[in-house]
Amino acid sequence: MEEAEKAKRRSIELLNETRNCAYSSFVALAEALNISLNEDMKNMAIGFAGGISGSGHICGALWGSIAAASLYTMKMMGDRRKIQNPLERYMPVYAKCAGIYRKFVELNGSPNCGDLNPNLDLVSVEQRRKCMEIVSRAVEITLSSLKDQKT
């Protein structure tokens, strides 16, 4: 099975288990990208679901994607502590994450949970299905964006 398809399926599995979009995208991507996370690191994502704890702001699936992309990009760039200028040190991460953000918005219409899920409904079958599509798409966008960095 193709890596992206496997990661997308894993994100849906996690979403069904947890009902947490941020956790699902973050953990599925970390697994696909061979980023080790302990339970505390995984649990860090929980409060970002529902657009930051149900507030409707930045989509949790997008948050999880940006967090995983940041970890992966920093890992692939190696030690950059000697670069004194923080902007220069982190610019490749900013650029990669900005690209993921733009693609997510292009495909979903908004980065905000409140727009993607106007009633902040995490219960109905219809909305859960929509969230599954959004989480799966976020994982696919992220892996596609990062594929050129893989070693």
UniProtKB/Swiss-Prot annotation:
Keywords: Membrane, Signal, Transmembrane, Transmembrane helix
Residue ranges crossing the lipid bilayer per the database entry: 45-67
Membrane topology according to the record: Single-pass membrane protein
Recorded superkingdom: Archaea
InterPro entries linked: CGCAxxGCC_motif, Multihaem_cyt_sf
Tagged with keyword Membrane: yes
Pfam families documented for this protein: C_GCAxxG_C_C (PF09719)
Principal localisation: membrane
Coiled-coil segments on the chain, per record: none
Subcellular location: Membrane
Signal peptide annotation: 1-32
Assigned GO CC terms: membrane
Protein name: Uncharacterized protein AF_0456
Species of origin: Archaeoglobus fulgidus (strain ATCC 49558 / DSM 4304 / JCM 9628 / NBRC 100126 / VC-16)
